[in-house]
């Protein structure tokens, strides 16, 4: 199918190299001469031309690389035994390294296993110790409750000993418990009289520490009476195995005294250092303090000391505890366990004899006393086994290396056999690539050289249009402009195709309003649609964000290609552009039956919309990748579905498979009738792919076509310039249209202006509301087709409105188009004195029409949508402007365009001259700077000018400015870039170079006004 691309870059891009795979013969316009050279003729020209210097250089590089490649293989073939020897050596080293690596992994695994077993034993030891601690604390509470809180006491030595023995199973880690009461010096005499014994010291007459917390049973006779002290802690209750410690003062021993003082001060259980028990095994004493009453957790130390009335101690046999634990955790691989008290610099062994060597793991033990530190050291009892896995793996690697060396030897002989054939094929390939590069550079150079003067031609034609011409001359100029734009469009298509094939086409990411882009596209094809009597409309879903981030130029190019094709191949009916999000389309597909639907914009049937969406899968090369359109995307991304529906001639079934093939036409008759190059749809498909989308279509001959594509864009976090105006807020409108799709389009444009809209299908319903007084709408928009269809009601409606003297009488609008204007229908508006709005509807055009009807005044005086000469003239009159461009034609065009608006223009043909003329102080109000110039480009010239201006501003701040700058606070000359290729990278470079904006070549009044108004409106000079 033939199509025409109306998007693409301008004519100022400097192309160095582009690659075009092929180009078919095409016709420009309706059948003039050849628009470009055919492929065969291009080949002839290329063969006749000498190879360019750059191509020759590349050919020499390619030839040199090939020669080096063949020489390298020849060297390998001649010295293959050295390579084989090196390979065997490398294989041996690799196998040895593998052995070391796997052996290290085995050791790491063994180390992790030891750590796991050691940590498990340490954890269980801590858990069992904590359980015993809890039971000791419960016993302390029992003593406090039944001994100190009862009068008389409910506990005596026999009761305590019996209870301790019967509950010993709850304290499997303790070998005995004892309770000592707190006695002051003043209470000692009475206490000893009540107990029947005197308080004794913990030390014997020999002043040596015993192996237990007091003398043994046979040492009672040698026990000494406790000398006077401030307070005492004599044992009054003890388990039978330790009842020999009854009457001994626990505060008389240094270790026990320190333990008791820390316990009653902290309110927690504390441990002693390891000591030998009566059974000659190491143990520790855990001490808890008994208080008169329950203390809060935040009690202070002195409060705890005052409330202390006794001390409960439990003796732990560490060796028995660890032995019991090891029996419970007997594993397949036994380990040696050693427990140490590491509180002091010299660790004290509490269990085990650390005589082993080798791998060791240390686990920290926490017995609840932060002042004591304990550790568990673990080692394997057996030596590690041989690392058979590492040995076999490394040996296997060595065998593989030897086999690979043998294969390498066979490969060398094989390569030597086919080397000559490969050399011949490489030479042929090199020649083909050289020819392809020459052809691509030729096409790119010729296209660029044609486009550059064409911009000058178009600019001069625009200037010629502003002179006094008669009707015939104006028609000639318009025809020349149309032909020039068609040629530029054709060149842009060729350059885009070359960019795509060379992989140099990139997308920009800038914020833009998609609704405004769609309106601009409708404005572009408005005249052609009206000439052919077609209904042209656009609808954008409310779920589409106001501002998106993407490449508006490429989206405009895709939609323009599709709409342009629809205009070209449609003779009656409509062309309908819609934009939705993917979720909306998917929900519609679930309920759509797929039957051909006549509920359309114009009433003509259209191709199956469902097949248009599903055909995206058909034209995807990989079937499984068709799910990518439905795959989840990032939260800031949005996937859009854009469709162009027409009621044209459709695409023959036999031609549908090659629609997206470059340079392919549906048939030879299409090229003769409609022209075109046949690459617009191919370019569109590539652009859609760059946007992470897909494109497909549904077409039925003599019914129409529906092209659908998806695009993934980003949501903009900034708010867009909503077109809604405060002047339309609170206004209600009624749309009368018997076609629901068309009514929805009208409602969409009204809602963009902030107008609340209601729909009705018949004029009778509107008349009924008018008669009943229930009509709240201030605006009534009636489609002309509905008006003519129900013409029997129109006289009654007009008379009703004329006789209505109310000030809030609704304004009546007729929505007309060439498609709804049969013979005689064009006089309808004049006959009934109605306001007419011509379709296709655009928000800006609708806004102006409604404002005029409501008695408003246009804010900007325009003619045919273009800023008038008077508006620009008021801004540029007598302004001193310098234009910098190395192209004389571009200088003339730019100077002529600015002089037309009253500016006084000075021209400079290089960046160096511009720097000289713009050295401050000077009299210029603004500068238009070309970006690409020889010697010094526009970016560098602008940077140097800004440096000179900053130097002057610093002098002004210091008060050293020249006299002509005495009244100036800050000097800055507006510099606008002149370019025809304003992509994102170019725009960013303009900002980096401190330019103030850009205008396209040739100048367009509307863009020129929007740029210069920022500097010249409301003041005479910007500095």
Swiss-Prot record:
Modified-residue entries (4-aspartylphosphate), positions: 783, 930
Alphabetical GO biological process terms:
cellular response to abscisic acid stimulus; cellular response to cold; cellular response to phosphate starvation; cellular response to sucrose stimulus; cytokinin-activated signaling pathway; defense response to bacterium; leaf senescence; negative regulation of iron ion transport
Q: What is its EC number?
A: 2.7.13.3
Tell me where on the tree of life, at the top rank, the source sits: Eukaryota
The lineage is:
Eukaryota, Viridiplantae, Streptophyta, Embryophyta, Tracheophyta
Q: Where are the transmembrane segments?
A: 81-101, 388-408
Chief subcellular site? membrane
Chain ranges on the Cytoplasmic side, renumbered to this chain: 1-80, 409-1023
Catalysis performed (reactions): ATP + protein L-histidine = ADP + protein N-phospho-L-histidine
Gene name per UniProt = HK3
Q: Which UniProt keywords apply?
A: Cell membrane, Cytokinin signaling pathway, Kinase, Membrane, Phosphoprotein, Repeat, Transferase, Transmembrane, Transmembrane helix, Two-component regulatory system
Q: Which GO terms describe its molecular function?
A: phosphorelay sensor kinase activity; protein histidine kinase binding
Please report the organism this UniProt entry assigns to the protein: Oryza sativa subsp. indica
- Residue intervals of the CHASE domain: 151-352
Q: Which GO terms describe its cellular component?
A: nucleus; plasma membrane
Q: What is known of its domains?
A: Histidine-containing phosphotransfer domain (HPt) contains an active histidine that mediates the phosphotransfer.
Polar residues bias: where? 817-827
Q: Name all Response regulatory domain ranges.
A: 732-854, 880-1016
Q: Where is this region: Disordered?
A: 812-831
Membrane topology label: Multi-pass membrane protein
Q: Summarize the PTM comment.
A: Activation probably requires a transfer of a phosphate group between a His in the transmitter domain and an Asp of the receiver domain.
Q: Which residues carry this modification: Phosphohistidine?
A: 448
Please give the name of this protein. Answer: Probable histidine kinase 3
Which residues face the membrane's Extracellular side?
A: 102-387
Q: Which PANTHER family match?
A: HISTIDINE KINASE 3, TWO-COMPONENT HISTIDINE KINASE
Q: What does this protein do?
A: Cytokinin receptor related to bacterial two-component regulators. Functions as a histidine kinase and transmits the stress signal to a downstream MAPK cascade.
Spell out the PROSITE patterns in the cross-references. CHASE (PS50839), HIS_KIN (PS50109), RESPONSE_REGULATORY (PS50110)
Location in or out of the cell: Cell membrane
Q: Which SUPFAM superfamilies does the record match to this protein?
A: ATPase domain of HSP90 chaperone/DNA topoisomerase II/histidine kinase (SSF55874), CheY-like (SSF52172), Homodimeric domain of signal transducing histidine kinase (SSF47384)
């Amino acid at each position: 199918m033939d199509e025409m691309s109306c998007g693409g870059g301008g004519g100022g891009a400097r192309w160095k190299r582009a690659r075009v795979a092929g180009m078919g013969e095409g016709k420009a316009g309706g059948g003039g001469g050849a628009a470009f050279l055919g492929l065969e003729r291009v080949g002839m020209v290329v063969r006749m031309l000498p190879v360019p210097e750059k191509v020759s250089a590349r050919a020499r590089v390619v030839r040199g690389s090939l020669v080096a490649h063949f020489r390298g293989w020849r060297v390998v073939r001649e010295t293959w035994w050295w390579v084989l020897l090196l390979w065997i050596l490398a294989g041996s080293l690799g196998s040895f390294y593998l052995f070391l690596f796997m052996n290290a992994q085995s050791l790491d695994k063994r180390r992790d296993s030891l750590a796991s077993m050691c940590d498990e034993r340490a954890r269980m030891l801590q858990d069992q110790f904590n359980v015993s601690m809890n039971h000791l604390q419960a016993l302390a509470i029992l003593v406090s409750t039944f001994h100190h809180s009862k009068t008389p006491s409910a506990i005596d030595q026999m009761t305590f000993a019996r209870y301790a023995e019967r509950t010993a199973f709850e304290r499997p880690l303790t070998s005995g418990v004892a309770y000592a009461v707190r006695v002051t010096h003043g209470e000692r005499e009475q206490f000893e009289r009540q107990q029947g014994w005197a308080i004794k010291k913990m030390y014997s007459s020999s002043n040596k520490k015993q192996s237990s917390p007091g003398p043994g049973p046979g040492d009672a006779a040698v026990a000494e009476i406790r000398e006077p002290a401030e307070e005492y802690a004599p044992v009054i209750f003890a388990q039978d195995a330790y009842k020999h410690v009854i009457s001994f003062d626990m505060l008389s021993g240094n270790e026990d005294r320190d333990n008791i003082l820390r316990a009653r001060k902290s309110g927690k259980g504390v441990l002693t250092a390891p000591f030998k028990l009566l059974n000659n095994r190491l143990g520790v004493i855990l001490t808890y303090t008994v208080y008169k009453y329950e203390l809060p957790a935040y009690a202070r130390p002195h409060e705890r000391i005052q409330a202390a009335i006794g001390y409960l101690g439990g003796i732990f046999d560490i060796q028995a505890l660890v032995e019991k634990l090891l029996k419970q955790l007997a594993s397949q691989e036994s380990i040696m366990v050693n427990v140490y008290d590491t509180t002091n610099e010299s660790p004290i062994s509490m269990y085990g004899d650390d005589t082993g060597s080798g791998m060791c793991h240390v686990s920290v033990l926490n017995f609840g006393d932060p002042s004591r530190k304990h550790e568990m050291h673990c080692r394997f009892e057996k030596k590690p086994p041989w690392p058979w896995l590492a040995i076999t793996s490394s040996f296997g690697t060595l065998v593989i290396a030897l086999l690979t060396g043998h294969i390498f030897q066979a490969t060398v002989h094989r390569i030597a056999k086919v080397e000559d054939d490969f050399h011949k094929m490489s030479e042929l390939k090199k020649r083909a690539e050289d020819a392809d590069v020459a052809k691509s550079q030729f096409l790119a150079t010729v296209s660029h050289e044609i486009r550059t003067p064409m911009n000058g031609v178009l600019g001069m034609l625009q200037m010629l249009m502003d002179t006094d011409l008669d009707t015939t001359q104006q028609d000639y100029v318009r025809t020349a402009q149309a032909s020039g734009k068609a040629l530029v469009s054709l060149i842009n298509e060729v350059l885009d195709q070359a960019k795509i094939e060379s992989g140099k086409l990139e997308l920009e990411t800038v914020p833009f309003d998609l609704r405004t882009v769609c309106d601009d596209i409708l404005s572009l094809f408005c005249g052609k649609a009206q000439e052919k009597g077609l209904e042209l409309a656009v609808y954008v879903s409310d779920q589409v964000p106001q501002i998106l981030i993407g490449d508006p130029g490429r989206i405009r190019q895709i939609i323009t290609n599709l709409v342009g094709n629809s205009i070209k191949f449609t003779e009656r009916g409509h062309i309908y552009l819609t934009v939705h999000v993917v979720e909306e389309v998917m929900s519609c597909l679930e309920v759509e039956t797929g039957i051909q639907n006549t509920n359309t914009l114009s009433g003509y049937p259209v191709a199956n919309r469902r097949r248009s969406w599903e055909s995206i899968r058909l034209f995807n090369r990989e079937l499984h990748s068709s799910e990518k359109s439905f795959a989840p995307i990032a939260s800031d991304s949005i996937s859009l579905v854009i469709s162009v529906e027409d009621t044209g001639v459709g695409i023959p079934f036999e031609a549908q498979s090659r629609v997206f093939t470059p340079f392919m036409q549906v048939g030879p008759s299409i090229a003769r009738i409609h022209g075109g190059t046949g690459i617009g749809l191919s370019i569109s498909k590539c652009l859609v792919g760059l946007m992470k989308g897909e494109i497909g279509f549904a077409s039925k001959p003599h019914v129409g076509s529906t092209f659908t594509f998806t695009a993934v864009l980003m949501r903009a976090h900034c708010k867009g310039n909503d077109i809604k105006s405060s002047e339309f807020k609170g206004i209600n409108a009624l749309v009368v249209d018997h076609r629901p799709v068309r009514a929805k389009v009208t409602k969409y444009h009204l809602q963009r202006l902030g107008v609340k809209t209601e729909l009705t299908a018949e004029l009778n319903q509107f008349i009924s509301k008018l008669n009943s007084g229930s009509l709240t709408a201030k605006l009534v928009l009636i489609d002309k087709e509905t008006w003519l269809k129900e013409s029997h009601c129109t006289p009654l409606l007009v008379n009703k409105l004329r006789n209505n003297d109310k000030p809030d009488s609704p304004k009546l609008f007729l929505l007309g188009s060439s498609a709804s204007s049969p013979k005689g229908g064009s006089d309808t508006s004049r006959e009934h004195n109605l306001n007419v709005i011509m379709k296709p509807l655009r928000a800006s055009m609708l806004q102006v029409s409604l404002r005029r009807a409501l008695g408003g005044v246009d804010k900007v005086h325009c003619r045919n949508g273009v800023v008038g000469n008077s508006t620009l003239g008021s801004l540029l009159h007598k302004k001193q402007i310098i234009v910098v461009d190395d192209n004389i034609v571009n200088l003339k065009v730019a100077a002529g365009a600015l002089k037309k608006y009253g500016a006084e223009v000075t021209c400079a043909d290089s960046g160096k001259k511009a720097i000289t003329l713009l050295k401050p102080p000077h009299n210029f109000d603004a500068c238009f700077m070309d970006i690409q110039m020889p010697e010094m480009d526009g970016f560098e010239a602008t940077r140097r000018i800004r440096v000179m201006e900053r130097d002057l501003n610093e002098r002004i701040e210091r008060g050293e400015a020249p006299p002509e700058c005495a009244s100036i606070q800050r000097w800055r000359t507006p510099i606008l870039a002149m370019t025809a290729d304003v992509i994102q990278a170019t725009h960013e470079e303009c900002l980096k170079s401190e330019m103030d904006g850009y205008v396209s070549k040739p100048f367009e009044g509307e863009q020129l006004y929007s740029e210069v108004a920022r500097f010249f409106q409301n003041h005479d000079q910007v500095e």
